[in-house]
């Protein structure tokens, strides 16, 4: 039997990949989204969740960034 899934290959640094693996393991998006963990910098994910992933990554980047006016 053959299973077909539409996916997207994501290339990222190892730190971001760990964040994606964390989101997948904790079911933060409501379901598992990683189809295949390929290597240290590549992950194959379900295509329909790419926009949600981009939002989560954006939130993470906003939390880790600071402006020059902050002390």
From Swiss-Prot:
InterPro entries: TFB5-like_sf (IPR035935), TFIIH_TTDA/Tfb5 (IPR009400). Keywords: Cytoplasm, Disease variant, DNA damage, DNA repair, Ichthyosis, Nucleus, Phosphoprotein, Transcription, Transcription regulation. It is found in: Nucleus; Cytoplasm. The modification Phosphothreonine is found at residue 69. The keyword Phosphoprotein applies. Pfam families: Tfb5 (PF06331). One of its GO terms (cellular component) is transcription factor TFIID complex. Component of the 7-subunit TFIIH core complex composed of XPB/ERCC3, XPD/ERCC2, GTF2H1, GTF2H2, GTF2H3, GTF2H4 and GTF2H5, which is active in NER. The core complex associates with the 3-subunit CDK-activating kinase (CAK) module composed of CCNH/cyclin H, CDK7 and MNAT1 to form the 10-subunit holoenzyme (holo-TFIIH) active in transcription. Belongs to the TFB5 family. Component of the general transcription and DNA repair factor IIH (TFIIH) core complex, which is involved in general and transcription-coupled nucleotide excision repair (NER) of damaged DNA and, when complexed to CAK, in RNA transcription by RNA polymerase II. In NER, TFIIH acts by opening DNA around the lesion to allow the excision of the damaged oligonucleotide and its replacement by a new DNA fragment. In transcription, TFIIH has an essential role in transcription initiation. This is General transcription factor IIH subunit 5. It comes from Homo sapiens. The gene is GTF2H5.
